[in-house]
């Protein structure tokens, strides 16, 4: 048992030594490179598929908090609405004013055209200032594949 233990200790020591040397050939990152990595633009897609004004207000608050925390120049935000959530993008909805404020701040608020078609809605029914995507779920999946962070309040 003593020989086996000595062998395992030797293997572990070798593995640790090799791991410690793994970074020796890499150049150290300059202060500018480290700062650039830290200040990389954040990209966030927010899903809203509920008709509940409370959920919408939470999503809109999330977008505002991101902009305040990171700065509007440091973050791209898309808020994608589909399914029952699309109703809050209609003119005169309970959150219409908040949506206007949000789009004015630079957040892209996007309506799913598949849902609009299913609910027999057209662009004149919808709030001014919003955008449109053919499929909300496809937009969200595409953004996640591109490395965007995903939020669903």
Identify the function of each model-found stretch.
Residues 17-20:
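C-terminal motif of bacterial Sec signal peptides marking the signal peptidase cleavage site
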Residues 38-51, 80-82:
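Acidic/histidine-rich, surface-exposed loop or edge segments in extracytoplasmic proteins
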Residues 92-153:
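A cross-taxonomic marker for long C-terminal extensions/tails that follow the last structured domain
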Residues 1-9:
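N-terminal export leaders
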Residues 57-71:
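Histidine-anchored nucleotide/phosphate-binding helix
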Residues 76-89:
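Acidic helix-start/capping segments at beta-turn-to-alpha-helix junctions
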Residues 22-24:
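Bacterial signal peptide processing site
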Residues 48-60, 86-89:
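Short, glycine-rich nucleotide/cofactor-binding loops
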